[in-house]
């Protein structure tokens, strides 16, 4: 690949670093709409979410700690935060997630099947439950169960029908993309699990809740409200935008666009040239070492 292709091009030093979003001065309140069908009800169809940015992609221990918190607070049997929200009927279902596949991971709590007028109570219950946990301590057995659950999954490395090597490479890519920390930390997690087991009795998880879920200005409370006819409205706006763009083009520009489209379709439908395929180097059995690398 290098000898026959890459070596014929000049190296470019491209600034591909993804910049971090600056923290908000205060938690934001956002209301958005999403489309529903005409025969679908709008009542009990709102989504409420409590979202906080937590750390960065390089901190593998914090990432695993928030996975454990998601389990202990919202997924485990009798999870306190989920149960409290269900008790006040904040929504028909409550769940959470932690996403560390981006530069600045976030933790979210979601109430599905709710209404806009439940937002204040939704937020109040979350803060009350989390505040009590910080003050009185988290359920250590639930946290330990979460750590054991994720450690077992890590040791088993059962990715179902997906190749293990592919899944490991995707884990590594999560850190590698952002040029932070050690990319291999994602596949060297045993030390992380040992540290978390010790941290259970050191107030570590309570401090994460206080710092990132209660006193963190970098977050938002989102209300996602259903609206009938929104899909048709957006489609009409897009058609008008495209028609305005089309009207701005000359006949020559339109003809050139048509020709480019035809050329693209012809390229996509054409089969591979056998001679081109023969140029691809094939791995020979003699290229493979008998001994595994140590």
PLM feature segments, named:
Residues 89-91, 175, 182:
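Short aromatic/hydrophobic-glycine micro-motifs
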Residues 119-143, 180-265:
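Ordered core of a single globular domain
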Residues 1, 109-111, 130-134:
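Conserved catalytic-core segments centered on acid/base and nucleophilic motifs
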Residues 3-60, 71-124, 139-167, 171, ...:
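Non-catalytic beta-strand/loop surface segments
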């Amino acid at each position: 690949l290098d000898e026959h292709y890459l070596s014929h091009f000049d190296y470019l030093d491209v600034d591909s670093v993804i910049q971090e979003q600056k923290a908000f001065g205060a938690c934001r309140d956002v209301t958005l709409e999403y489309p529903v069908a005409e025969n679908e009800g709008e009542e009990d169809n709102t989504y409420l979410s409590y979202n906080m940015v937590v750390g960065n992609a390089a901190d593998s221990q914090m990432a695993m700690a928030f996975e454990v918190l998601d389990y202990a607070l919202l997924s485990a049997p009798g999870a306190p935060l989920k149960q409290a929200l269900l008790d006040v009927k904040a929504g028909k279902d409550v769940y959470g997630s932690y996403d560390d596949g981006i530069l600045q991971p976030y933790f979210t709590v979601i109430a599905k099947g709710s209404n806009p007028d439940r937002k204040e109570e939704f937020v109040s219950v979350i803060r009350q439950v989390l505040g009590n946990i910080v003050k009185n301590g988290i359920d250590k057995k639930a946290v330990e169960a979460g750590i054991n659950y994720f450690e077992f999954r890590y040791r088993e490395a059962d990715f179902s029908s997906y190749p293990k090597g592919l899944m490991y490479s995707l884990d590594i890519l999560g850190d590698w993309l952002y040029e932070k920390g050690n990319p291999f930390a994602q596949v060297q997690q045993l030390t992380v699990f040992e540290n978390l087991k010790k941290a259970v009795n050191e107030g570590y998880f309570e401090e994460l809740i206080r710092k990132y879920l209660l006193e963190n200005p970098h977050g938002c409370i989102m209300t996602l409200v259903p609206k009938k006819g929104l899909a048709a409205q957006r489609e009409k706006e897009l058609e008008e935008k495209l028609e305005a763009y089309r009207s701005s083009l000359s006949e020559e520009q339109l003809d050139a666009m048509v020709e480019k489209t035809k050329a693209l379709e012809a390229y996509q439908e054409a089969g591979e040239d056998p001679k081109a395929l023969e140029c691809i180097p094939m791995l020979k059995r003699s290229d493979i070492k008998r001994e595994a690398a140590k």
